Amino acid sequence: MTTAAQIPGLEAAPTKHARLVAWVREIAELTQPERVEWCDGSEAEFDRLTSLLIEKGTLVRLNDEKRPNSFYAASDPSDVARVEDRTYICSEKAEDAGPTNNWMDPAEMRVKLQGLFEGSMRGRTMYVVPFCMGPLGSHISALGVEITDSPYVVISMRTMTRMGAPALEQLGEDGFFVPAVHSLGAPLESGAADVPWPCNTTKYITHFPETREIWSYGSGYGGNALLGKKCYALRIASVMARDEGWLAEHMLILKLTSPAGKVHYIAAAFPSACGKTNLAMLIPTLPGWKAETVGDDIAWMRFGEDGRLYAVNPEAGFFGVAPGTGEQTNPNAIKTLWGNTVFTNVARTDDGDVWWEGLTKQAPGHLTDWKGRDWTPESTEPAAHPNARFTVPAGQCPTIASEWQDPKGVPISAILFGGRRATAVPLVTEAPDWRRGVFFGSIVASETTAAQAGAIGKLRRDPFAMLPFCGYNMADYFAHWLEVGQKADQAKLPRIYYVNWFRKSPEGKFLWPGFGENSRVLAWIVGRLEGHADGVETPLGVLPTRDALPTDGLQIDEADLDALLTVDIDVWKQEAELIPEHYQTFGDRLPAALWAEHEALVSRLDG
């Protein structure tokens, strides 16, 4: 076995952080790489690594005239998405992981990982990637170091985080960091040929909440391999937030300026495929309103000295789903992707650009699909994988807010929760207090089957849009939200709203046009925050009056508008009957306050 002293580059650590240096040495001895590189995040390093990846066949440089400094990657067809069934929360006690997470005894998992990681980087370079989640120097930010044997991960981390020398400098000689180890699980024996996308059929994405560690094996794909994203910024950070009294959330952050010049910041949590990025990059249809982007996916929120809740976007880039993103749905995203972008599992055009379903109304006559095959509009499979991605610097977004890197964060005025609901849930409902808002967050769901008229389809619950990302028992997470609200100055807490852009008629037609028209709902919310928009009390909460929701210039049927702005008592009685089954999943750890909210809803519906 090679000792640490024999591994080139290991002793060249550009830091005096003793714990970091010792940990890197320990992982090098375990994984046995050919050499170690300490990443500085420089442009020269990026250029060197992209050239290496082109040489290996992992990346293809796109046409510089069409897409400057941009690249295309195609993954192994077995490695295309997050692997929820291989994602573990290894808390000391199983009950602390809770019923919504996979748990394994940490001692057992460590033995398993030890066996998998032993020699797993043989024949490869081990990269040490220091990074900062959130603006450098912010009291809301936190540091991490990822060790990886994937240069694709290194270049992606440079886009998605503040990576390299500045993060290492911030760490100093004894600063706290989350250690994150990633291996493709594809050691290269001497003289063996590599493949363009190395990975392993065995995959483990593991989190140790008490020790704040992340270990990921076998996947080179996004959320499994870019460990600053879901693994740190949500699963580990949610545990840190619980212990330290803050919030780490799966939320966009939007800056809204009214025609009167008043600014409000709004955070919103929606499950995937419910329009989070589209709302984050909203182009308002209402005259005089301006929307700007602070973040599209994750928010870290702490109370400031003035008692208000301040949020930062811990990421530095967007890791977005390409299919469905087009001029019609999200023109700002399309403008963001002009260059400096890595596209993964999209299709390639004959002139060296990229394409995916939804980019244009008509597909090109010929493409190379994500599996490298010829594709024409007559082909039976999509040209791009449905989870094809783009990785792009957030600063390129034309609507990026000037405050997006403000170390103080931005003060949140309102928090939105919502799922994809064809039935029951009105367009927008205001919670009368924080507790009702937490109740709304706890019951968020999307309908996975079509509903019959007057009935509810099959629901997939995704409380707070955190189901795949909460790093501890979700019942304790609800309790944490309730506690955060109890301790705060009630007058300064953000107001909470339950929204639904996806109501359908019995015939299956969307009742609300969505996209830029959602600015009308935001205008009513701002009106409520400022005390000049009317609402009507319902058993669910406060809904807009017909006159209070700005509908000028909107082509919408009166009956559809009525359905959007009504709480159907009979349907909501059915909805309320479905909640206990969801709550019982959490057993006696579910906060009594949420059962009380449910009982109060039932009694208001009966009233």
UniProtKB/Swiss-Prot annotation:
Disulphide bond pairs: none
Subcellular location: Cytoplasm
Main enzyme class: lyase
Keywords attached to this entry: Cytoplasm, Decarboxylase, Gluconeogenesis, GTP-binding, Lyase, Manganese, Metal-binding, Nucleotide-binding
Coiled coil: none
Known pathway: Carbohydrate biosynthesis; gluconeogenesis
Binding-site residues for Mn(2+), renumbered to this chain: 230, 250, 297
Function of the protein: Catalyzes the conversion of oxaloacetate (OAA) to phosphoenolpyruvate (PEP), the rate-limiting step in the metabolic pathway that produces glucose from lactate and other precursors derived from the citric acid cycle.
Subunit structure: Monomer.
Protein name: Phosphoenolpyruvate carboxykinase [GTP]
